[in-house]
């Protein structure tokens, strides 16, 4: 139905807001709904929520609000934090996702419409073409990715020095990682 994120934003004339991001609803959730509604085909979905206070609370809310998804939270169940998950990848010889290697705290789409001011200024530096295209899309759609107490913040008007620096997710292998994956050879 939709070719990509850009197609969703243009056709829906909506980026994000109180009801979430248009691309999340139409490119991720719609696919899940179609699969989970097929009788006998849905054993649950694995969610990558990591073991930290915010994500545990998010998982609890998600399970309460979406029981039909039969959510599975293996990282939380095994008490694996995001830094430990990255450490496990490293120990297994699996390349850490590019966005983490570039210093981002999440591995979302490049130019995720849910990112904050600091995130967008980092995107401006790291991916100037993507930043410019999203700024163009905002004008085409008539909506913005960013808002503050004064209203909309257009990317093409965003002060390059505004916003907090993105905090990189550092790779780690704590005692949990070491115990769980003692047999994985270090690389």
Language-model-detected regions and their locations in the chain:
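Nucleotide-activated chemistry modules centered on ATP-dependent adenylation/adenylyltransferase
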Residues: 1-187
